[in-house]
């Protein structure tokens, strides 16, 4: 069997590494570089990848694709995609399934299909170095990638001819690269990963015990639409706006000019990491009736920092939240690892150092650490690297919608993966023959406030009173963070499952907003949950009371029956409202009005010589009421 290579599939640049003896080695590509631009160009005769594609971008802007990772697993209508449409020189289009695809020379291409070209280049680079075929890989993704984005990355690997043995989170890979072989007994590190298109922060504990190293992710967070591209776009907008003020010409309408400005903006940003100012000179950038126009602009480091300071500040806010989730204080962090090319910016380094009160490590290559870590994980899977245990986490809570529109969480965020969790639910109606399992992801109590990942039906449930059938719902997250959900009728053994494949996955802004909303609305969520619990109790008591009235028959006087039915009707009316206290008061009223019912039941029991029945319960022990839709045949 050949080696398992490690690939950092980046937004801006990609990198490939492999275990060489007991160390991971980054492999140079055909151009002699250790990283490859994640750029793909389609010409009349061939497909170019990497530096050759980048060199011809100015003359072929509409067919030169970059930052495709920002589109992977996203819907066309999403805010992030709509924002990118305005600034990308190539055409982003809506696929038949609603995904964001790219139109190249009249053909619609899916992001995994395009990303596969970069992976093919990485595969060929490794094969040239090793002198043998490569078929297996570990590929890294941002820690905050959702299920759809992870699956799309696996699809890209398949298209490239690779068996993706593991998807590993980028900060975790960087921690592996940093900590492998360390003799320190116990250390907690923060990995701040600001790449070309994504941002991640992970708090990771590295333990050494009896010769075995354990890398345990305590918490993770980030933004899958924040990175160097966004920094570049701020500079691009500034250059274009300044030129428009001077010449009254908007370069955004000229794809070739826009590509030249993009290259100049990226170059200026990089130069300002070591210089205090730089000149942007683009002669013959465009022309009008008066003749050719030239662009000349001086940009200072201070100006650049003013343009992007809010982006850096937002990353620090994510850092605070993840530290809180990890249950760690700033003083408990032993080392800070900076990963991703954008961390070379002095402002980023300064703000991170100010937050932690110490400088980040300088001995970790931000462009190569992730690929090295992926290669180490490949070595672990292959058995070449021993005594290393990696414990990663899922970034968001997972659950299903239950009675009253509540999200019942089965797996909490920052749970170590792989993991499996089951819970028993039941039906909400008598003789319900089918249920719909609605799978959710998020941190809010109200189901509608979370992200829907998909739904499926479990049919063929035997007719039974509500609350009697036992439906076991199981969530299973594998080591790649990919989700499987199943539902099983414990009475009949019938089972249905779904592998969550909806490409309308969570956006970074939705994820962050969910967490922020959950914190800001904790009190509102608590009150909502209490009202729902009261409603569910009211519903159960109303159902049980009506059943007892029917069973009592003529043994119950007309006056008592009317009194009880009136109390039940008032309870049902109260349950439609938002007043928990009123619902509870009406529950007490029904219980009081139902005393004659208990007397009738006791009399019947005594006549039959049986035991006195206990008051009916709205719930069976260990069974959670769940409101499922009944699936009806349309015949």
From Swiss-Prot:
The keyword Ribonucleoprotein does not apply. It holds the Pfam family HSP70. InterPro entries: ATPase_NBD, Chaperone_DnaK, Heat_shock_70_CS, HSP70_C_sf, HSP70_peptide-bd_sf, Hsp_70_fam. The keyword ATP-binding applies. GO terms for molecular function: ATP binding; ATP-dependent protein folding chaperone; unfolded protein binding. Residues 602-617 have a biased composition (Low complexity). Keywords: ATP-binding, Chaperone, Nucleotide-binding, Phosphoprotein, Stress response. Residues 602-635 are annotated as: Disordered. Acts as a chaperone. This is Chaperone protein DnaK. It comes from Haemophilus influenzae (strain PittEE).
């Amino acid at each position: 069997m050949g080696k398992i290579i490690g690939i950092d599939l980046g937004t801006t640049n990609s990198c490939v590494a492999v275990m060489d003896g007991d160390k991971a080695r980054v492999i140079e590509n055909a151009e002699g570089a250790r990283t490859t631009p994640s750029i793909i160009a389609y010409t009349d005769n061939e497909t170019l990848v990497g530096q050759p594609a980048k060199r011809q971008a100015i003359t072929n802007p509409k067919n030169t694709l970059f930052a495709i990772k920002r589109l992977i697993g996203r819907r066309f209508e999403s805010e992030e995609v709509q924002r990118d449409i305005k600034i990308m020189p190539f055409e982003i289009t809506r696929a038949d399934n609603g995904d964001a695809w790219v139109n190249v020379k009249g053909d619609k291409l899916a992001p995994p299909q395009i990303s596969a070209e970069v992976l093919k280049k990485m595969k060929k680079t490794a094969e040239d170095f090793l002198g043998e075929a490569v078929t297996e890989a570990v590929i890294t993704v941002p820690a905050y990638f959702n299920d759809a984005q992870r699956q799309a990355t696996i699809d890209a690997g398949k298209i490239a001819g690779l068996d993706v043995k593991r998807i590993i989170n980028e900060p975790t890979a960087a921690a592996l690269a940093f900590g492998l072989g360390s003799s320190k007994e116990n250390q907690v590190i923060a990995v701040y990963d600001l790449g070309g298109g994504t941002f991640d922060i992970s708090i990771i504990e590295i333990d050494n015990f009896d010769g075995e190293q354990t890398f345990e992710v305590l918490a993770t967070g980030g933004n899958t639409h924040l990175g160097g591209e966004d920094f570049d776009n701020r500079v691009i907008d500034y250059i274009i706006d300044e030129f428009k003020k001077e010449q009254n010409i908007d370069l955004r309408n000229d794809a070739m000019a826009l590509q030249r400005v993009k290259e100049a903006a990226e170059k200026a940003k990089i130069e300002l990491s070591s210089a205090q100012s730089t000149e942007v000179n683009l002669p013959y950038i465009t022309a009008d009736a008066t003749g050719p126009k030239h662009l000349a602009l001086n940009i200072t480091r201070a100006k650049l920092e003013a343009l992007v300071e809010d982006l850096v500040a937002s990353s620090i806010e994510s850092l605070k939240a993840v530290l809180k989730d990890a249950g760690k204080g700033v003083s408990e962090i032993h080392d800070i690892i900076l990963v991703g090319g954008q961390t070379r910016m002095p402002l980023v380094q300064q703000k991170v150092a100010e937050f932690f009160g110490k400088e980040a490590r300088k001995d970790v290559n931000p462009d190569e650490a992730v690929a090295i870590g992926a290669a180490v994980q490949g070595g672990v899977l292959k058995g070449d690297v021993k005594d290393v245990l990696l414990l990663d986490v899922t970034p968001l809570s997972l659950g299903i919608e239950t009675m009253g529109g509540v999200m019942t969480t089965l797996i909490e965020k920052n749970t170590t993966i792989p993991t499996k969790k089951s819970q028993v639910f039941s039906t909400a109606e008598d003789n319900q023959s089918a249920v719909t399992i609605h799978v959710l992801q998020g941190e809010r109590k109200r189901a509608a406030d979370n992200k829907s990942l998909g739904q499926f039906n479990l049919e063929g449930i035997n007719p039974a009173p509500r609350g009697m059938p036992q439906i076991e719902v199981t969530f299973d997250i594998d080591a790649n963070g990919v989700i499987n959900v199943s539902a099983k009728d414990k009475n009949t053994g019938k089972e249905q499952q779904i592998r969550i494949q909806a490409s309308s996955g969570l956006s970074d802004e939705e994820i962050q907003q969910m967490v922020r909303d959950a914190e800001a609305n904790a009190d509102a969520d608590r009150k909502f949950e209490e009202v729902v619990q009261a409603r569910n109790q009211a519903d159960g008591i109303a159902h049980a009371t009506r059943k007892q009235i029917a069973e009592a028959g003529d043994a119950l006087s007309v006056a008592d029956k009317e009194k009880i039915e009136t109390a039940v009707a008032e309870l049902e009316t109260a349950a439609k409202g938002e007043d928990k206290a009123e619902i509870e008061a009406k529950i007490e009223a029904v219980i009081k009005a139902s005393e004659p019912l208990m007397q009738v039941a006791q009399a019947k029991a005594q006549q039959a010589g049986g035991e006195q029945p206990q008051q009916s319960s709205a719930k069976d022990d260990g069974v959670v009421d769940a409101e499922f839709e009944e699936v009806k045949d349309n015949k």
